[in-house]
Amino acid sequence: MKTAWVFPGQGSQAVGMTGSLPETERGRRRLAEAEEILGWSVLEKCQGDEAELGLTRHTQPCLYVVETILADLLTERGQTPDYVAGHSLGEYSALYSAGVFDFETGLKLVQKRALLMEAAQGGKMAAVIKFDPEQLQELLAAYPEVVLANDNSAEQVVLSGPAEAMEQVLPQLKAKRVVPLKVSGAFHSPQMTAA
């Protein structure tokens, strides 16, 4: 049997997501190293205010640090993946896990990415689950500023676009569920061009 590690991206963050990681030697070292690189405490952001953690400049580095600590702990326990993948920001954790770059290099890349994306903030994203594909295509044609940001499966996609346009499109969707994502911008859309 093959093993794949798939790392999530922004929107998957949650207050308390460090769990018991600070109690491990690896966790303590990585959290201290991250604080030195970033100039602020990942642990404090992850255990503090949800709005503060939700800021892109904090969310992305926090997710990267937590994900890479988890990957390192699994590796230390003799578990290794046959494949790695990531969704958006999670690609950085996947690249780290594959040995493409070291922790510090990855964190510096993620920090820069987060600052650029936050500067281009504005807009919204939403996951759309079990939807009418024809109706979705019609809405995207009628509102070209709203784009299909992620085509995750035949039953789940993510839309991204300016807040006003998203607020017009989302209520019209024929879908089982529409879940607004906890992000500060219209990521994976033309609004990120400046980033």
Language model region names:
Residues 2-85, 159:
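Helix-rich "cap/lid" substructures immediately adjacent to catalytic or cofactor-binding pockets
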Residues 10-12, 38-40, 98-195:
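Alpha/beta catalytic cores of group-transfer enzymes, especially the acyltransferase/condensing modules
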Residues 16-18, 46, 93, 97, ...:
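Residue-level recognition of conserved structural "scaffold" positions that shape functional pockets
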Residues 50, 89, 185-186:
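Positions that flank functional sites
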Residues 53, 92-93, 158, 189:
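Short secondary-structure boundary/hinge segments and terminal tails
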Residues 60-127:
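Gly/Ser-rich oxyanion-binding loop with an adjacent helix/lid
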